[in-house]
Each structure stands twice: as structure tokens, then as C-alpha cells.
Amino acid sequence: CYIQNCPVG
């Protein structure tokens, strides 16, 4: 993911 609030990287 490109966002910090992503449950799984």
C-alpha cells in the first residue's frame, strides 16, 4: 500500500 492507514502493507 501507498497509504499509512493500510491494514496490510
Curated annotation (Swiss-Prot):
<feature type="modified residue" description="Glycine amide">
    <location>
        <position position="9"/>
    </location>
</feature>
<keyword id="KW-0372">Hormone</keyword>
<keyword id="KW-0964">Secreted</keyword>
<keyword id="KW-1015">Disulfide bond</keyword>
<keyword id="KW-0027">Amidation</keyword>
<dbReference type="GO" id="GO:0005185">
    <property type="term" value="F:neurohypophyseal hormone activity"/>
</dbReference>
<feature type="disulfide bond">
    <location>
        <begin position="1"/>
        <end position="6"/>
    </location>
</feature>
<dbReference type="GO" id="GO:0005576">
    <property type="term" value="C:extracellular region"/>
</dbReference>
<comment type="similarity">
    <text>Belongs to the vasopressin/oxytocin family.</text>
</comment>
<protein>
    <recommendedName>
        <fullName>Valitocin</fullName>
    </recommendedName>
</protein>
<dbReference type="InterPro" id="IPR022423">
    <property type="entry name" value="Neurohypophysial_hormone_CS"/>
</dbReference>
